[in-house]
């Protein structure tokens, strides 16, 4: 059984950052993308060392991908055919492209977003039998009801936006709109289920559908459609449903969604630092 753990980091140029939270920012508040860019730079070596430490502790090789020729080629290709897709979304499609590239060599793969901090030496692969399905986190609990949505309650990256965007795509495919909001910050998968997912098999048509839906008000009101976009997690949810792919939901121990809580529970194994408060993560790590 060949296994691999990998992560990925691109320092997106400031002039290519999309200020997606403009409408929810308070006066003098720094946009989330700027905070992310700065915190990744400041914590780069610690974040990299942490993932290497975890991989070594469970005896699995680790690979780090960054701004190399392979990424540049992918970005150039995507922006050539889909110039309306932001660099942020290109980056997130690429991390899934890497999943497929690695599946050509490895049987089981664990992907960790660069803002994930490992707090355990417990072996992910021994705790999650990937023959049972792709292991991801269910973010549906963060979805707002349609009547409560305003420009101030969400952004284009909010779970709410992804939920209704996936509904719209599924309906376009004449499928049930029932879906889960997937978070792709941590993914455990094997070759068999990735092949069944067929994430990139119909990519051109999927992106065209997503583009058409950004201006289609036939089913959803404008206040919903205005938040539709080209998110990798939206498409991931659609593909899980479209191809009936087995899935198992990571619990809070293995994917702790660290956002506004201000603390990390003792039993946590992987912290996904959405808020980029790495100082809290390091205090927990070194405790």
Regions found by a protein language model. Name each.
Residues 10-13, 68-72, 116-118, 141-142, ...:
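Short, solvent-exposed loop/turn segments at secondary-structure junctions
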Residues 6-8, 65-66, 112-114, 120-121, ...:
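Short His-Asn-centered micro-motif
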Residues 87-157, 189:
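GT-A fold catalytic core of metal-dependent nucleotide-sugar glycosyltransferases
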Residues 1-94, 101-105, 227-231, 274-281:
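N-terminal anchoring/stem segment of glycosyltransferases
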Residues 48-52, 99-100, 124-126, 236-237:
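Short amphipathic alpha-helical segments and helix-helix/interface helices
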Residues 16-39, 74-86, 144-173, 210-222:
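Charged, glycine/proline-rich intrinsically disordered loops and linkers
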Residues 59-72, 112-114, 246-261:
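Acidic carboxylate-rich catalytic motifs and surrounding loops in phosphoryl-/glycosyl-chemistry enzymes
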Residues 169-283:
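Catalytic core and acceptor-binding pocket of nucleotide-sugar-dependent glycosyltransferases
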């Amino acid at each position: 059984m060949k296994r691999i753990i990998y992560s990925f980091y691109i320092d997106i140029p400031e002039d290519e950052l999309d200020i997606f939270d403009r409408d929810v920012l308070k006066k003098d508040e720094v946009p989330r993308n700027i905070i992310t860019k700065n915190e990744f730079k400041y914590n780069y070596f610690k974040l990299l060392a942490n993932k290497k430490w975890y991989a070594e502790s469970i005896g699995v090789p680790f690979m780090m991908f960054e701004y190399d020729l392979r990424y540049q080629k992918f970005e150039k290709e995507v922006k050539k055919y889909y110039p309306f897709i932001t660099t942020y979304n290109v980056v997130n499609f690429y991390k899934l492209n890497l999943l497929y590239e690695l599946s050509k060599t490895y049987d089981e793969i664990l992907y960790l977003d660069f803002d994930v901090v490992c707090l355990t030496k417990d072996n992910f692969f021994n705790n999650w039998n990937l023959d049972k399905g792709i292991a991801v986190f269910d973010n549906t609990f963060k979805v707002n009801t349609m009547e409560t949505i305003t420009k101030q309650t969400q952004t284009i990256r909010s779970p709410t936006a992804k939920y209704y965007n996936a509904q719209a795509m599924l309906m376009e495919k004449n499928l049930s709109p029932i879906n889960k909001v997937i978070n792709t910050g941590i993914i455990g998968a094997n070759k068999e289920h990735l092949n069944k997912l067929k994430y990139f098999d119909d990519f051109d048509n999927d992106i065209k559908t997503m583009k058409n839906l950004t201006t289609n008000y036939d089913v959803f009101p404008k206040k919903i459609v205005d938040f539709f976009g080209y998110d990798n997690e939206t498409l991931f949810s659609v593909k899980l449903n479209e191809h009936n792919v087995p899935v198992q939901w990571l619990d809070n121990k293995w994917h702790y969604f660290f956002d506004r809580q201000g603390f990390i529970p003792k039993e946590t194994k992987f912290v996904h630092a959405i808020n980029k408060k790495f100082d809290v993560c390091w205090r927990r790590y070194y405790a």
